Protein backbone atom coordinates (compact mmCIF):
# COMPACT_ATOMS: atom_id res chain seq x y z
CA UNK A 1 0.00 0.00 0.00
CA UNK A 2 2.76 2.47 0.96
CA UNK A 3 4.67 1.69 -2.23
CA UNK A 4 1.51 2.28 -4.27
CA UNK A 5 1.17 5.77 -2.81
CA UNK A 6 4.85 6.51 -3.48
CA UNK A 7 4.59 5.34 -7.09
CA UNK A 8 1.43 7.36 -7.67
CA UNK A 9 3.30 10.55 -6.73
CA UNK A 10 5.37 10.20 -9.92
CA UNK A 11 2.15 10.16 -11.94
CA UNK A 12 0.52 13.01 -10.02
CA UNK A 13 3.69 15.10 -10.37
CA UNK A 14 3.74 14.49 -14.11
CA UNK A 15 0.07 15.40 -14.45
CA UNK A 16 0.65 18.62 -12.51
CA UNK A 17 3.31 19.78 -14.99
CA UNK A 18 1.17 18.69 -17.95
CA UNK A 19 -1.81 20.71 -16.64
CA UNK A 20 0.21 23.86 -15.95
CA UNK A 21 1.64 23.76 -19.48
CA UNK A 22 -1.69 22.99 -21.16
CA UNK A 23 -3.72 25.62 -19.34
CA UNK A 24 -0.80 28.05 -19.61
CA UNK A 25 -1.32 27.97 -23.37
CA UNK A 26 -5.11 27.70 -23.42
CA UNK A 27 -5.90 30.50 -20.96
CA UNK A 28 -4.11 33.14 -23.06
CA UNK A 29 -4.35 31.63 -26.53
CA UNK A 30 -6.85 34.16 -27.94
CA UNK A 31 -4.54 37.01 -26.90
CA UNK A 32 -1.52 35.24 -28.46
CA UNK A 33 -3.34 34.77 -31.77
CA UNK A 34 -4.34 38.45 -31.86
CA UNK A 35 -0.98 39.93 -30.88
CA UNK A 36 1.47 37.52 -32.54
CA UNK A 37 -0.46 36.23 -35.56
CA UNK A 38 -2.45 39.46 -35.95
CA UNK A 39 -5.82 37.69 -36.19
CA UNK A 40 -9.08 39.58 -35.71
CA UNK A 41 -11.23 39.06 -32.62
CA UNK A 42 -13.66 36.53 -34.09
CA UNK A 43 -10.96 34.47 -35.81
CA UNK A 44 -8.80 34.41 -32.67
CA UNK A 45 -11.72 33.32 -30.47
CA UNK A 46 -12.85 30.70 -32.98
CA UNK A 47 -9.34 29.30 -33.47
CA UNK A 48 -8.74 29.17 -29.71
CA UNK A 49 -11.99 27.24 -29.29
CA UNK A 50 -11.03 24.88 -32.13
CA UNK A 51 -7.65 24.21 -30.51
CA UNK A 52 -9.19 23.45 -27.13
CA UNK A 53 -11.75 21.20 -28.79
CA UNK A 54 -9.06 19.29 -30.66
CA UNK A 55 -6.98 18.81 -27.52
CA UNK A 56 -9.86 16.86 -25.98
CA UNK A 57 -10.89 15.11 -29.18
CA UNK A 58 -7.45 13.48 -29.30
CA UNK A 59 -8.33 11.80 -25.98
CA UNK A 60 -10.12 9.18 -28.10
CA UNK A 61 -6.86 8.43 -29.89
CA UNK A 62 -5.05 7.94 -26.60
CA UNK A 63 -7.82 5.75 -25.18
CA UNK A 64 -7.90 3.56 -28.28
CA UNK A 65 -4.16 2.90 -28.61
CA UNK A 66 -3.79 2.37 -24.85
CA UNK A 67 -6.60 -0.20 -24.69
CA UNK A 68 -5.75 -1.96 -27.93
CA UNK A 69 -1.99 -1.80 -28.48
CA UNK A 70 0.42 0.07 -26.23
CA UNK A 71 -1.02 0.11 -22.72
CA UNK A 72 -1.28 3.25 -20.59
CA UNK A 73 2.41 3.74 -19.74
CA UNK A 74 3.83 3.54 -23.26
CA UNK A 75 0.99 5.72 -24.57
CA UNK A 76 1.80 8.41 -21.98
CA UNK A 77 5.53 8.27 -22.80
CA UNK A 78 5.10 8.56 -26.57
CA UNK A 79 2.55 11.36 -26.49
CA UNK A 80 4.47 13.31 -23.83
CA UNK A 81 7.41 13.38 -26.27
CA UNK A 82 5.06 14.78 -28.95
CA UNK A 83 3.83 17.32 -26.37
CA UNK A 84 7.42 18.42 -25.66
CA UNK A 85 8.31 18.71 -29.35
CA UNK A 86 5.21 20.83 -29.96
CA UNK A 87 6.26 23.27 -27.23
CA UNK A 88 9.75 23.47 -28.73
CA UNK A 89 8.25 24.40 -32.12
CA UNK A 90 5.94 26.95 -30.48
CA UNK A 91 8.82 28.55 -28.56
CA UNK A 92 10.98 28.78 -31.69
CA UNK A 93 8.11 30.39 -33.61
CA UNK A 94 8.18 33.33 -31.17
CA UNK A 95 11.96 33.64 -30.82
CA UNK A 96 13.49 33.19 -34.29
CA UNK A 97 13.06 36.31 -36.47
CA UNK A 98 12.31 34.39 -39.66
CA UNK A 99 9.54 32.41 -37.91
CA UNK A 100 7.83 35.33 -36.14
CA UNK A 101 4.20 35.80 -37.19
CA UNK A 102 4.37 32.48 -39.07
CA UNK A 103 0.91 30.95 -38.87
CA UNK A 104 2.13 27.58 -40.16
CA UNK A 105 4.84 27.17 -37.52
CA UNK A 106 2.65 28.44 -34.69
CA UNK A 107 -0.28 26.18 -35.55
CA UNK A 108 2.03 23.21 -36.10
CA UNK A 109 3.34 23.63 -32.56
CA UNK A 110 -0.11 24.27 -31.12
CA UNK A 111 -1.66 21.16 -32.65
CA UNK A 112 1.29 18.97 -31.69
CA UNK A 113 0.62 20.14 -28.13
CA UNK A 114 -3.10 19.41 -28.59
CA UNK A 115 -2.30 15.86 -29.74
CA UNK A 116 0.22 15.18 -26.98
CA UNK A 117 -1.79 16.69 -24.13
CA UNK A 118 -5.12 15.25 -25.24
CA UNK A 119 -3.96 11.70 -25.85
CA UNK A 120 -2.46 11.41 -22.36
CA UNK A 121 -5.61 12.63 -20.55
CA UNK A 122 -7.63 9.37 -20.42
CA UNK A 123 -4.49 7.32 -19.76
CA UNK A 124 -2.95 9.24 -16.87
CA UNK A 125 -5.75 8.72 -14.32
CA UNK A 126 -6.23 5.08 -15.35
CA UNK A 127 -2.48 4.44 -15.06
CA UNK A 128 -2.43 5.98 -11.59
CA UNK A 129 -5.30 3.74 -10.46
CA UNK A 130 -3.49 0.72 -11.90
CA UNK A 131 -0.81 1.13 -9.22
CA UNK A 132 -3.25 0.02 -6.51
CA UNK A 133 -4.59 -3.46 -5.84
CA UNK A 134 -8.26 -4.13 -6.55
CA UNK A 135 -8.74 -4.54 -2.79
CA UNK A 136 -7.76 -0.88 -2.38
CA UNK A 137 -10.59 0.31 -4.61
CA UNK A 138 -12.74 2.06 -2.03
CA UNK A 139 -9.95 3.65 0.05
CA UNK A 140 -6.60 4.16 -1.65
CA UNK A 141 -8.02 4.58 -5.14
CA UNK A 142 -10.55 7.09 -3.86
CA UNK A 143 -7.75 9.10 -2.26
CA UNK A 144 -5.73 8.95 -5.47
CA UNK A 145 -8.58 10.37 -7.57
CA UNK A 146 -9.17 13.15 -5.03
CA UNK A 147 -5.51 14.18 -5.18
CA UNK A 148 -5.54 13.79 -8.95
CA UNK A 149 -8.50 16.16 -9.35
CA UNK A 150 -6.95 18.63 -6.91
CA UNK A 151 -3.71 18.53 -8.92
CA UNK A 152 -5.53 19.49 -12.11
CA UNK A 153 -7.31 22.34 -10.33
CA UNK A 154 -4.13 23.75 -8.79
CA UNK A 155 -2.33 23.42 -12.13
CA UNK A 156 -5.09 25.42 -13.81
CA UNK A 157 -4.90 28.03 -11.04
CA UNK A 158 -1.15 28.55 -11.47
CA UNK A 159 -1.53 28.67 -15.24
CA UNK A 160 -4.24 31.32 -15.07
CA UNK A 161 -2.20 33.53 -12.73
CA UNK A 162 1.57 33.04 -12.79
CA UNK A 163 1.98 31.75 -16.36
CA UNK A 164 -0.41 34.31 -17.87
CA UNK A 165 1.34 37.10 -15.94
CA UNK A 166 4.74 35.98 -17.26
CA UNK A 167 3.44 35.85 -20.83
CA UNK A 168 1.90 39.32 -20.61
CA UNK A 169 4.88 40.96 -18.89
CA UNK A 170 7.94 39.09 -20.19
CA UNK A 171 6.76 37.96 -23.61
CA UNK A 172 5.73 34.76 -25.35
CA UNK A 173 9.24 33.40 -25.86
CA UNK A 174 9.98 33.29 -22.14
CA UNK A 175 6.44 32.15 -21.34
CA UNK A 176 6.46 29.24 -23.80
CA UNK A 177 10.11 28.47 -23.04
CA UNK A 178 9.34 27.93 -19.35
CA UNK A 179 6.46 25.62 -20.27
CA UNK A 180 8.81 23.63 -22.51
CA UNK A 181 11.23 23.18 -19.61
CA UNK A 182 8.32 22.17 -17.38
CA UNK A 183 7.25 19.36 -19.75
CA UNK A 184 10.87 18.24 -19.98
CA UNK A 185 10.89 17.93 -16.19
CA UNK A 186 7.57 16.09 -16.31
CA UNK A 187 8.96 13.56 -18.77
CA UNK A 188 12.08 13.04 -16.64
CA UNK A 189 9.92 12.58 -13.54
CA UNK A 190 7.73 10.03 -15.33
CA UNK A 191 10.71 7.97 -16.49
CA UNK A 192 12.35 8.06 -13.05
CA UNK A 193 9.58 5.88 -11.66
CA UNK A 194 9.64 3.34 -14.50
CA UNK A 195 11.07 0.44 -12.51
CA UNK A 196 8.32 0.77 -9.89
CA UNK A 197 5.26 0.98 -12.14
CA UNK A 198 2.65 -1.73 -12.38
CA UNK A 199 1.74 -1.92 -16.06
CA UNK A 200 -1.33 -3.82 -17.20
CA UNK A 201 -1.37 -5.37 -20.64
CA UNK A 202 -3.89 -4.01 -23.15
CA UNK A 203 -7.02 -6.19 -23.22
CA UNK A 204 -8.59 -5.04 -26.45
CA UNK A 205 -10.67 -2.07 -27.42
CA UNK A 206 -14.36 -1.75 -26.51
CA UNK A 207 -14.82 -0.25 -29.97
CA UNK A 208 -14.02 -3.67 -31.44
CA UNK A 209 -16.52 -5.46 -29.18
CA UNK A 210 -19.24 -2.97 -30.11
CA UNK A 211 -18.52 -3.38 -33.80
CA UNK A 212 -18.75 -7.15 -33.36
CA UNK A 213 -22.26 -6.77 -31.91
CA UNK A 214 -23.40 -4.59 -34.82
CA UNK A 215 -21.93 -6.92 -37.44
CA UNK A 216 -23.32 -10.07 -35.79
CA UNK A 217 -26.78 -8.52 -35.42
CA UNK A 218 -26.82 -7.50 -39.09
CA UNK A 219 -25.79 -10.98 -40.18
CA UNK A 220 -28.79 -12.40 -38.29
CA UNK A 221 -31.21 -9.72 -39.46
CA UNK A 222 -33.74 -12.26 -40.78
CA UNK A 223 -33.61 -14.54 -37.74
CA UNK A 224 -36.30 -14.42 -35.05
CA UNK A 225 -35.44 -13.91 -31.40
CA UNK A 226 -36.31 -16.92 -29.20
CA UNK A 227 -39.16 -16.39 -26.75
CA UNK A 228 -36.95 -17.71 -23.97
CA UNK A 229 -34.05 -15.30 -23.52
CA UNK A 230 -32.06 -18.01 -21.75
CA UNK A 231 -31.50 -19.57 -25.18
CA UNK A 232 -29.30 -16.59 -26.06
CA UNK A 233 -25.53 -16.84 -25.61
CA UNK A 234 -24.52 -15.96 -22.05
CA UNK A 235 -21.03 -15.01 -20.91
CA UNK A 236 -21.32 -17.43 -17.99
CA UNK A 237 -21.81 -20.30 -20.43
CA UNK A 238 -18.70 -19.56 -22.47
CA UNK A 239 -16.10 -18.09 -20.16
CA UNK A 240 -13.66 -17.69 -23.04
CA UNK A 241 -16.07 -15.15 -24.53
CA UNK A 242 -16.22 -12.99 -21.42
CA UNK A 243 -14.80 -9.61 -22.40
CA UNK A 244 -15.63 -7.60 -19.29
CA UNK A 245 -16.04 -8.09 -15.55
CA UNK A 246 -19.79 -7.68 -15.30
CA UNK A 247 -22.85 -9.72 -16.29
CA UNK A 248 -25.64 -7.38 -17.37
CA UNK A 249 -29.35 -8.12 -17.39
CA UNK A 250 -30.83 -8.52 -20.86
CA UNK A 251 -33.12 -5.59 -21.74
CA UNK A 252 -35.85 -5.16 -24.41
CA UNK A 253 -34.58 -1.79 -25.69
CA UNK A 254 -32.75 -1.90 -29.03
CA UNK A 255 -34.04 -5.46 -29.40
CA UNK A 256 -32.52 -5.74 -32.87
CA UNK A 257 -29.08 -5.93 -31.24
CA UNK A 258 -30.17 -8.98 -29.21
CA UNK A 259 -30.00 -10.99 -32.42
CA UNK A 260 -26.21 -10.91 -32.11
CA UNK A 261 -26.64 -13.44 -29.25
CA UNK A 262 -28.73 -15.97 -31.19
CA UNK A 263 -26.77 -19.22 -31.38
CA UNK A 264 -26.61 -20.86 -34.81
CA UNK A 265 -24.47 -23.54 -36.45
CA UNK A 266 -22.73 -20.97 -38.67
CA UNK A 267 -21.26 -19.31 -35.57
CA UNK A 268 -18.70 -22.09 -35.23
CA UNK A 269 -15.76 -23.00 -37.44
CA UNK A 270 -15.09 -26.59 -38.54
CA UNK A 271 -12.65 -26.84 -35.64
CA UNK A 272 -15.42 -25.84 -33.21
CA UNK A 273 -14.04 -22.37 -32.45
CA UNK A 274 -16.44 -19.46 -32.00
CA UNK A 275 -16.44 -16.56 -34.46
CA UNK A 276 -16.77 -13.33 -32.39
CA UNK A 277 -18.05 -11.49 -35.48
CA UNK A 278 -21.02 -13.88 -35.70
CA UNK A 279 -21.89 -14.57 -32.05
CA UNK A 280 -21.74 -12.21 -29.06
CA UNK A 281 -22.78 -12.68 -25.45
CA UNK A 282 -25.82 -10.90 -24.03
CA UNK A 283 -23.52 -8.93 -21.72
CA UNK A 284 -21.50 -7.79 -24.71
CA UNK A 285 -24.73 -6.65 -26.37
CA UNK A 286 -25.76 -4.82 -23.21
CA UNK A 287 -22.41 -3.01 -23.16
CA UNK A 288 -23.32 -1.39 -26.47
CA UNK A 289 -26.86 -0.67 -25.28
CA UNK A 290 -25.50 1.05 -22.17
CA UNK A 291 -23.47 3.41 -24.32
CA UNK A 292 -26.44 4.09 -26.60
CA UNK A 293 -28.62 4.98 -23.59
CA UNK A 294 -25.99 7.43 -22.38
CA UNK A 295 -25.63 9.28 -25.68
CA UNK A 296 -28.74 11.57 -25.53
CA UNK A 297 -27.81 12.76 -22.03
CA UNK A 298 -24.14 12.97 -22.99
CA UNK A 299 -25.05 15.25 -25.90
CA UNK A 300 -26.67 17.80 -23.57
CA UNK A 301 -23.37 18.23 -21.72
CA UNK A 302 -21.69 19.57 -24.86
CA UNK A 303 -23.30 23.01 -24.58
CA UNK A 304 -22.15 23.32 -20.97
CA UNK A 305 -18.61 22.70 -22.22
CA UNK A 306 -19.18 25.41 -24.84
CA UNK A 307 -20.01 27.86 -22.04
CA UNK A 308 -16.84 26.89 -20.15
CA UNK A 309 -14.77 27.37 -23.31
CA UNK A 310 -15.89 30.99 -23.55
CA UNK A 311 -14.00 31.81 -20.36
CA UNK A 312 -10.71 31.69 -22.25
CA UNK A 313 -12.06 33.10 -25.52
CA UNK A 314 -14.99 35.53 -25.61
CA UNK A 315 -14.75 36.49 -21.92
CA UNK A 316 -11.09 37.42 -22.48
CA UNK A 317 -11.94 39.63 -25.45
CA UNK A 318 -14.68 41.29 -23.43
CA UNK A 319 -12.13 41.92 -20.67
CA UNK A 320 -9.67 43.55 -23.09
CA UNK A 321 -12.21 46.36 -23.59
CA UNK A 322 -12.56 46.98 -19.84
CA UNK A 323 -10.34 48.78 -17.34
CA UNK A 324 -7.68 46.26 -16.30
CA UNK A 325 -5.97 48.53 -13.76
CA UNK A 326 -6.29 47.89 -10.04
CA UNK A 327 -4.18 50.59 -8.44
CA UNK A 328 -0.67 50.09 -9.82
CA UNK A 329 -1.44 46.50 -10.83
CA UNK A 330 -2.42 45.55 -14.38
CA UNK A 331 -4.77 42.54 -14.44
CA UNK A 332 -4.39 40.29 -17.52
CA UNK A 333 -7.93 39.54 -18.82
CA UNK A 334 -7.12 35.83 -19.10
CA UNK A 335 -6.23 35.67 -15.39
CA UNK A 336 -9.90 36.21 -14.41
CA UNK A 337 -10.40 32.46 -14.98
CA UNK A 338 -8.66 32.15 -11.61
CA UNK A 339 -12.01 32.91 -9.98
CA UNK A 340 -13.52 29.90 -11.73
CA UNK A 341 -10.75 27.67 -10.38
CA UNK A 342 -10.96 29.13 -6.86
CA UNK A 343 -14.72 28.59 -6.91
CA UNK A 344 -14.21 24.92 -7.76
CA UNK A 345 -11.59 24.52 -5.01
CA UNK A 346 -13.81 26.15 -2.37
CA UNK A 347 -17.22 24.91 -3.49
CA UNK A 348 -16.32 21.23 -3.97
CA UNK A 349 -15.82 20.51 -0.23
CA UNK A 350 -18.76 22.80 0.61
CA UNK A 351 -20.95 20.63 -1.58
CA UNK A 352 -20.03 17.56 0.46
CA UNK A 353 -20.26 19.28 3.84
CA UNK A 354 -23.36 21.44 3.38
CA UNK A 355 -25.40 20.71 0.27
CA UNK A 356 -25.47 16.91 0.53
CA UNK A 357 -26.78 16.86 4.16
CA UNK A 358 -29.46 19.43 3.30
CA UNK A 359 -30.50 17.64 0.12
CA UNK A 360 -30.56 14.31 1.98
CA UNK A 361 -33.31 15.63 4.26
CA UNK A 362 -35.54 16.32 1.24
CA UNK A 363 -34.69 13.39 -1.03
CA UNK A 364 -33.96 10.66 1.52
CA UNK A 365 -31.00 9.58 -0.64
CA UNK A 366 -27.62 8.92 0.96
CA UNK A 367 -25.78 11.15 -1.53
CA UNK A 368 -28.48 13.84 -1.41
CA UNK A 369 -28.89 14.36 -5.13
CA UNK A 370 -28.66 11.78 -7.86
CA UNK A 371 -25.84 12.18 -10.37
CA UNK A 372 -28.32 13.35 -13.01
CA UNK A 373 -29.93 15.88 -10.66
CA UNK A 374 -26.50 17.26 -9.82
CA UNK A 375 -25.55 17.53 -13.49
CA UNK A 376 -28.87 19.23 -14.30
CA UNK A 377 -28.30 21.92 -11.67
CA UNK A 378 -24.96 22.59 -13.34
CA UNK A 379 -26.75 23.14 -16.66
CA UNK A 380 -29.01 25.67 -14.94
CA UNK A 381 -25.97 27.61 -13.73
CA UNK A 382 -24.67 27.76 -17.31
CA UNK A 383 -27.81 29.75 -18.19
CA UNK A 384 -27.30 32.16 -15.28
CA UNK A 385 -23.63 32.64 -16.22
CA UNK A 386 -24.54 33.63 -19.78
CA UNK A 387 -27.28 35.98 -18.58
CA UNK A 388 -24.73 37.62 -16.26
CA UNK A 389 -22.28 38.05 -19.15
CA UNK A 390 -25.02 39.53 -21.37
CA UNK A 391 -26.10 42.06 -18.72
CA UNK A 392 -22.48 43.07 -18.10
CA UNK A 393 -21.80 43.58 -21.81
CA UNK A 394 -24.98 45.66 -22.20
CA UNK A 395 -23.78 47.90 -19.35
CA UNK A 396 -20.26 48.08 -20.84
CA UNK A 397 -21.68 49.24 -24.18
CA UNK A 398 -23.75 51.85 -22.33
CA UNK A 399 -20.60 53.15 -20.63
CA UNK A 400 -18.77 53.20 -23.98
CA UNK A 401 -21.56 55.37 -25.42
CA UNK A 402 -21.53 57.74 -22.43
CA UNK A 403 -17.75 58.15 -22.67
CA UNK A 404 -17.82 58.73 -26.44
CA UNK A 405 -15.74 55.62 -27.16
CA UNK A 406 -18.09 53.81 -29.55
CA UNK A 407 -15.89 54.52 -32.56
CA UNK A 408 -12.60 54.16 -30.68
CA UNK A 409 -10.87 50.81 -30.31
CA UNK A 410 -10.03 51.36 -26.63
CA UNK A 411 -11.14 50.07 -23.23
CA UNK A 412 -13.91 51.75 -21.25
CA UNK A 413 -13.52 52.90 -17.63
CA UNK A 414 -15.63 50.01 -16.30
CA UNK A 415 -13.49 47.70 -14.14
CA UNK A 416 -12.72 44.20 -15.38
CA UNK A 417 -13.54 42.96 -11.88
CA UNK A 418 -17.21 43.09 -12.90
CA UNK A 419 -16.48 39.89 -14.83
CA UNK A 420 -15.94 37.97 -11.60
CA UNK A 421 -19.63 36.94 -11.13
CA UNK A 422 -19.85 35.22 -14.52
CA UNK A 423 -16.62 33.30 -13.85
CA UNK A 424 -17.87 32.27 -10.39
CA UNK A 425 -21.19 31.09 -11.84
CA UNK A 426 -19.38 28.95 -14.42
CA UNK A 427 -17.25 27.50 -11.60
CA UNK A 428 -20.31 26.57 -9.53
CA UNK A 429 -21.82 25.00 -12.63
CA UNK A 430 -18.69 22.90 -13.10
CA UNK A 431 -18.87 21.58 -9.53
CA UNK A 432 -22.38 20.36 -10.22
CA UNK A 433 -22.26 19.39 -13.89
CA UNK A 434 -18.75 18.11 -14.51
CA UNK A 435 -18.39 16.03 -11.34
CA UNK A 436 -21.99 14.82 -11.67
CA UNK A 437 -21.35 13.85 -15.28
CA UNK A 438 -18.18 11.90 -14.48
CA UNK A 439 -19.84 10.10 -11.56
CA UNK A 440 -22.88 9.26 -13.71
CA UNK A 441 -20.79 7.86 -16.56
CA UNK A 442 -18.62 5.84 -14.17
CA UNK A 443 -21.66 4.45 -12.37
CA UNK A 444 -23.62 3.56 -15.51
CA UNK A 445 -20.79 2.30 -17.72
CA UNK A 446 -20.11 -1.45 -17.74
CA UNK A 447 -16.76 -2.36 -16.20
CA UNK A 448 -15.11 -2.99 -19.56
CA UNK A 449 -16.15 0.36 -21.08
CA UNK A 450 -15.30 2.78 -18.29
CA UNK A 451 -12.15 4.03 -20.03
CA UNK A 452 -14.24 4.67 -23.13
CA UNK A 453 -16.78 6.62 -21.09
CA UNK A 454 -13.97 8.71 -19.61
CA UNK A 455 -12.91 9.54 -23.15
CA UNK A 456 -16.54 10.38 -24.01
CA UNK A 457 -16.66 12.78 -21.06
CA UNK A 458 -13.53 14.51 -22.37
CA UNK A 459 -15.09 14.55 -25.83
CA UNK A 460 -17.87 16.85 -24.57
CA UNK A 461 -15.19 19.46 -23.85
CA UNK A 462 -13.81 18.98 -27.34
CA UNK A 463 -17.18 19.34 -29.02
CA UNK A 464 -17.98 22.31 -26.79
CA UNK A 465 -14.99 24.11 -28.26
CA UNK A 466 -16.17 23.35 -31.77
CA UNK A 467 -19.72 24.47 -30.95
CA UNK A 468 -18.42 27.80 -29.65
CA UNK A 469 -16.34 28.24 -32.80
CA UNK A 470 -19.31 27.48 -35.06
CA UNK A 471 -21.70 29.81 -33.19
CA UNK A 472 -19.12 32.62 -33.23
CA UNK A 473 -18.45 32.24 -36.94
CA UNK A 474 -22.08 31.97 -38.04
CA UNK A 475 -23.43 34.80 -35.86
CA UNK A 476 -20.68 37.15 -36.96
CA UNK A 477 -21.15 36.32 -40.64
CA UNK A 478 -24.92 36.79 -40.42
CA UNK A 479 -25.26 39.58 -37.84
CA UNK A 480 -21.76 41.09 -37.44
CA UNK A 481 -22.13 41.24 -33.65
CA UNK A 482 -18.42 40.84 -32.83
CA UNK A 483 -16.21 43.28 -34.80
CA UNK A 484 -12.58 44.02 -33.89
CA UNK A 485 -13.82 47.08 -32.01
CA UNK A 486 -16.25 45.56 -29.52
CA UNK A 487 -17.48 49.06 -28.64
CA UNK A 488 -19.20 49.06 -32.03
CA UNK A 489 -20.50 45.52 -31.69
CA UNK A 490 -23.24 43.66 -29.85
CA UNK A 491 -21.47 40.93 -27.92
CA UNK A 492 -24.39 41.11 -25.49
CA UNK A 493 -26.68 39.68 -28.16
CA UNK A 494 -24.29 36.77 -28.65
CA UNK A 495 -24.48 36.03 -24.92
CA UNK A 496 -28.29 36.24 -25.01
CA UNK A 497 -28.34 33.78 -27.91
CA UNK A 498 -26.17 31.31 -25.98
CA UNK A 499 -28.42 31.78 -22.92
CA UNK A 500 -31.44 30.78 -24.99
CA UNK A 501 -29.64 27.74 -26.36
CA UNK A 502 -28.67 26.73 -22.82
CA UNK A 503 -32.30 27.01 -21.71
CA UNK A 504 -33.42 24.79 -24.59
CA UNK A 505 -30.58 22.40 -23.77
CA UNK A 506 -31.76 22.13 -20.14
CA UNK A 507 -35.27 21.24 -21.33
CA UNK A 508 -33.87 18.48 -23.55
CA UNK A 509 -31.78 17.18 -20.64
CA UNK A 510 -34.79 17.02 -18.32
CA UNK A 511 -36.77 15.12 -20.96
CA UNK A 512 -34.15 12.39 -21.44
CA UNK A 513 -33.01 12.25 -17.80
CA UNK A 514 -36.58 11.66 -16.59
CA UNK A 515 -36.88 8.70 -18.99
CA UNK A 516 -33.45 7.19 -18.46
CA UNK A 517 -33.40 3.50 -17.43
CA UNK A 518 -30.51 2.65 -15.16
CA UNK A 519 -28.13 -0.22 -15.76
CA UNK A 520 -28.92 -3.45 -13.90
CA UNK A 521 -26.27 -6.06 -13.20
CA UNK A 522 -27.02 -9.74 -12.63
Language-model region placement:
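Hydrophobic transmembrane alpha-helices of multi-pass solute transporters/permeases
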Residues: 1-522
Amino acid sequence: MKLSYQVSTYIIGTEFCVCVAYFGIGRNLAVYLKTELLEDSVTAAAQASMWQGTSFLTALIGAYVADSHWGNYLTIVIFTVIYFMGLVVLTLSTSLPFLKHSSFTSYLGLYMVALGAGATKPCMSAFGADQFDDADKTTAKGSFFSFYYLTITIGALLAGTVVVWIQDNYGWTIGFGLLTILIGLAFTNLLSGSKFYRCRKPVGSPFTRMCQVIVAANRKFNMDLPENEFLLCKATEKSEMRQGNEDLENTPEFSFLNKASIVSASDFTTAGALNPWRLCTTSQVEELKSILRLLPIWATFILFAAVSTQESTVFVEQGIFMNTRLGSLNIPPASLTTFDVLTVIVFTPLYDMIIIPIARQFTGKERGLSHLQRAGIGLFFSIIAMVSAALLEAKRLEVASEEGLVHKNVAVSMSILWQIPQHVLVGIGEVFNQIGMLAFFYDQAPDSTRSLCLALALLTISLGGYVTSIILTITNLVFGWIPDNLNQGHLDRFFWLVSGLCLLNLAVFVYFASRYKYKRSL
